[in-house]
Structures are given as C-alpha cells and as structure tokens.
Amino acid sequence: MNSNKMTINLALFGMTQSGKSSAGNIILGSTDFHSSFAPCSVTRDCSLGRSCHFRSFMRRGGQEVTLQVQVLDTPGYPHSRLSKKHVRQEVREALAHHFGQEGLHLALLVQRADVPLCGQEESSPVQMIQELLGHTWMNYTAILFTHAEKIEEAGFNEDEYLREASETLLKLLNSIQHRYIFQYKKGNSLSEQRLKILERIIEFVKENCYQVLTFK
C-alpha cells in the first residue's frame, strides 16, 4: 500500500427523492449515478462510483496525500417498487462486495433539509443503517442535508434550523456526535459544493482516526 495515497469509502442511505444520487455525483465530480425528479424511486440497484485522484488535497503524518473517494449509491428506503427485504439484502451484499476488506469509512444519511425528520420516517433508513452496520453504526454515520438553500429561503441560519429541529432529528444527531453536512446548491458552483462536503467528510474520518467498518 502506498502511504502517499488514500481511498475514502462512503455509502449513501436515505429515503426516495432525498437527493442521494445527486449528492453522490457532487462528491465524485461526475455523473456516475442516474438522478432525476420522479414521483417514484429512481435508483433500483447499488452502484459504486470512483472519483479522480485529488493531489495535495490533504496531509497525513506530515506528508501530502493523494486522495480518491469511492461512493456506494443505494436504492431509496423504503422503495416505491422494491420490498424492504430486497433492498436490505441488495445493500448488504454490495457492502460486503465493495467494502468487505477495505472497509467503510462513513455512511451518509441523506436527508432533505426541507422535509422534517419524524419518528415513523426516521425508522426506515436509520433502521437499515443500524441493521447493516451493526452496534457501532453511530461511530460511522453522518447526516448530509440536501436542499440546504431552503433553510436560508425560510429565514433561518444553520444553528437556528437545528435548534428548531424535531426531537427525532436531535436525538439522532446526539447519537452520531453531531456529524452533519449542509449541501447548498444556490450560489455555489459544483466544485465549491464538492470541496466543502469533502472537507467535512475528511474531518469526520480524521476524528475517527481513519478507522473503518468491515463486512463479511
């Protein structure tokens, strides 16, 4: 293994039309994942995308590191066409296939900022994360809020938004040590969005001492 190169492995989870595939494309700087508005679930299968190599993006042990990001996109959960059992099995197999040995650095729960996270809704994607990642899931999970520009349009800033959040969301944030990222589209180029998201992801991975979750 080349100590001057590093691969960060991510998996995206979330409800249908939460913006998972679009967020994955922004992180990768590509159009690997099909993303579109639809009245039903768009993603039916798990898919792995890889970014180009980022040179001198970060330092580790005093040396510059070339970074590559791998992102696993997963079907929405619950899905409009597939059973919960089918989706869980599909994702379980994909995690084992792609990250079985290399390990997963971070699971991103993709949540629309303009859709309140309530108890019944929270039970689905979060429940799947808990089941598939195991009892240490909270150490490897962060929330990615998409459509964050809606917060500003409503007259809130990020802190005010979180203070007014549902009890369900606040409990979830507490359990994952307040790891969250806001994704803005309005007024930001794709490269700016990507850079800000990647910087936060690297921050979380560093705080976790670069540990990974492996799958058998």
Curated annotation (Swiss-Prot):
Keywords: GTP-binding, Nucleotide-binding. This is GTPase IMAP family member GIMD1. Residues 5-216 form the AIG1-type G domain. GTP binds at G14, M15, T16, Q17, S18, G19, K20, S21, S22, S35, H147, A148, E149. GO terms for molecular function: GTP binding. The keyword Transmembrane does not apply. The keyword Nucleotide-binding applies. Belongs to the TRAFAC class TrmE-Era-EngA-EngB-Septin-like GTPase superfamily. AIG1/Toc34/Toc159-like paraseptin GTPase family. IAN subfamily.
